[in-house]
Amino acid sequence: MADHSPIYVGLLFSVTGDISTIETSQLRGTLFAIDEVNQAGGINGREIVPIHYDPQSSPGLYRVLAERLILENKINVMFGCYMSSTRKAVIPIIERWNRLLFYPTLYEGFECSSNIVYTGAAPNQNSIQLAEFMMENYGERVYLVGSDYIYPYESNRIMTDLVRQRQRGEKVGERYVPLDATGEDFKDVIADIKDKQPHFIFSTVVGNSTQLLYRAYADAGFDPRTMPIASLTTLEAELAQMGKGVGAGHVSAAPYFQSIATPKNIDSLEKFRTRFGTDVVPNAGWEAAYFQVHMFAQAMQLSGSDAIDALMPNLLGMEFDAPQGRVRIDPSNHHTCLFPRIGIANDEGQFTIVREATRAVHPDPYLIAHSLGDWTVSLKTPK
């Protein structure tokens, strides 16, 4: 007799707190994909039923709620986390109970858990390309500003190493602000930037305080044509928070931008807006959250079980036609082959893509084999 019982999955995305904007978009991307799978008949006739908890942007709550999902809700698979501090809070729980986390966010690399599938960009899929683009087009003096937690520190270290590969590459300053930063926190940062006069600013500020940095930059009269902010974490959702025009001229790197003009992306955006409206802004985190659900569904369809030991042989090496292009989970490190892109923000709150990969770049979370100028990660100007 066929099993038609529901498949419960856990969702750990904050809808309150400092990272609520980006995680709400990831939550909606996840729910969108679950809807698509269920409307197509589910997984072997079984409906996916999400159990969502709001960790309120608190790493401690992610840990508590991950354990609740496992012990009380009996789930085997969860999707979630944006900040590295929240992912690291969850890792001991999923490893202790041998459960699976799909993590849909770029991060600093230098990690490989057998209980995680990483669908966001590794450093060789964004940092290298961004560093090369900025130094070729703006100059080799960088000022680093970030939020005060692990990802910005590690990402800034990587950017510093990349800049220093150039003979004249130089880090001229580095500052950090609280996750719940206010406008006051950026006054000293802006004053220091005025004093140091870098060629570009590399921002790893995350969450709802991102808009404050860009507004402070604009209020200071800085010009993005000569000293832009470059970022891996400022995407369409953050531009929408700032208001149109505030982020224009600044540069970001990501595998996905809404402006990708492929039939798959255009169709996905249209269906998403029809289902959920326009209050949530799709971005790279949204797209990774979306396609990882489909990859889970395909793997479970083959395995017949959501137990990690049954899923993993089918997940590793799996491919999927995502809005960014055809992605693949690398069997050697549980990370995903993605399509790096560089975008410059425009007045409409979107990104004009100025560089993009012609093929998927294999993830190298430990940056073992890559450096500036490496042909395997280089980008081309779109035709």
Q: At which residue positions do the language-model features occur?
A:
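Beta-alpha junction/loop-to-helix N-cap segments that form part of ligand/metal-binding clefts
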Residues: S25-Q26, I43-G109
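Solvent-exposed, acidic/polar segments of extracytosolic/periplasmic ligand-binding ectodomains
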Residues: I7, P323-K383
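Short beta-strand elements at the ligand-binding edges of bilobed clamshell
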Residues: D54, F110-E132, G247-Y256
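Extracellular/periplasmic periplasmic-binding protein-like sensory domains
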Residues: Y217-Y290, I368, S378-P382
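Extracytoplasmic "Venus flytrap"
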Residues: D3, G10-L31, Y53-P59, V281-G285
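Signal peptide-proximal N-terminal region
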Residues: G29-P50, Q167
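Extracellular/periplasmic Venus flytrap/periplasmic-binding protein
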Residues: N115-D219, P263
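Periplasmic-binding protein-like
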Residues: L69-Y82, F102-P104, Y143-G146, K196-N208, ...
